Amino acid sequence: MSAIVDIIGREVLDSRGNPTVECDVLLESGVMGRAAVPSGASTGSREAIELRDGDKSRYLGKGVLKAVEHINTEISEAIMGLDASEQAFLDRTLIDLDGTENKSRLGANAMLAVSMAVAKAAAEEAGLPLYRYFGGSGAMQMPVPMMNIVNGGAHANNSLDIQEFMVMPVGQSSFREALRCGAEIFHALKKILADKGMSTAVGDEGGFAPNFASNEECLNTILSAIEQAGYKAGEDVLLALDCAASEFYKDGKYHLEGEGLQLSSEDFANYLANLADKFPIVSIEDGMHESDWAGWKALTDKLGKKVQLVGDDLFVTNTKILKEGIEKGIANSILIKINQIGTLTETFAAIEMAKRAGYTAVISHRSGETEDSTIADIAVGTNAGQIKTGSLSRSDRMAKYNQLLRIEEDLGDIASYPGKSAFYNLR
């Protein structure tokens, strides 16, 4: 019987040393599910609300004891005795209990921890790996990783305005080989930076954060690392950017302070199109401010046929906003962050809506992570085809990559690696 008999919430620390929420869910049969939630640095204004205590005497106000208390009292009372295998009903119970549009009463961090822990307990009870529990017998596609090897913007203390410079190994026949490719490029880049006397310290997501003079210098250095690692850019490996443009949009202009530029939406769209012409860039995330829908439309009209344009702050894993974007022809892909929306059921609904509209879905970590690897199972369980979970260092990032290695091994001969076909909506 998969009835829930005990729920325990607790405060633990994330990869940045900030508190986050962990939850254990115990079932009548004795099996347990445990989940910990991540936390973002650059956040969309319409994300579900992460409940923090605001008590400056503890953890600089970032404690999560209120969220934990909600798990141990109200949430526990509401779902005790429910069947853990009824995920949609359970998540709806949490949503109704919270009663707000943005989960600000109970906290999306409290709700998500419970939602994930319940799913893990139910999978354990069913004797299934989590990815199989999520996706059934059709779950067999490994994701192409977006590997964030250079950090800028809000993730680093340097002069790069673009937040993430990523490599995507697409010319390999398996996830295992793709991971090796990414790791070899990471180490080649480290040597290049060290030889130039540049910093090889890593940022929140495990990428390097050196002081490049410009975005183009950074991209050219990454191309050199790809070549030195023995791979061909444009064939074996493609590039991806996360502009996080909301972070440098002020008074209607895009301020690239590192390059001394102030650009209109149209000029910034041209700037990105120029980069995409010069470099093998296949994906650009948050290329415009989350509220600059006219800019997004211009960017989509200009690049949407040949570059994956991913909405993160734009869509915040929210089906209402995604639906509007689809209707208006804005972007062609959605970034999926489980803590932006706060339950697994709503997360899966966003992935499904994107796929039906011919948009791609990229499953993503946050900059503040834990050892929890649920997103790896979500990526395979939904056959998403892409995952974004950091660079090739820091064990909070490796936890997801290593889980994907285990899943690929478990799948055996039926595992498929999509490579370039992950971008099924590009020409």
From Swiss-Prot:
Q: How is its cofactor bound, per UniProt?
A: Binds a second Mg(2+) ion via substrate during catalysis.
Q: What Pfam families would the database entry show?
A: Enolase_C, Enolase_N
Q: Where in the cell is it found?
A: Cytoplasm; Secreted; Cell surface
Which terms under GO biological process does the entry name? glycolytic process
Broadest EC class?
Answer: lyase
Pathway(s): Carbohydrate degradation; glycolysis; pyruvate from D-glyceraldehyde 3-phosphate: step 4/5
Similarity section:
Belongs to the enolase family.
Provenance organism: Ralstonia pickettii (strain 12J)
- Which GO molecular function entries does the Swiss-Prot or TrEMBL record give? magnesium ion binding; phosphopyruvate hydratase activity
Q: What is its main location?
A: cytoplasm
Task: Give the residues the record marks as binding (2R)-2-phosphoglycerate.
Answer: Q163, K337, R366, S367, K388
What is its cofactor?
Answer: Mg(2+)
HAMAP family from the xrefs?
Enolase
UniProt protein name: Enolase
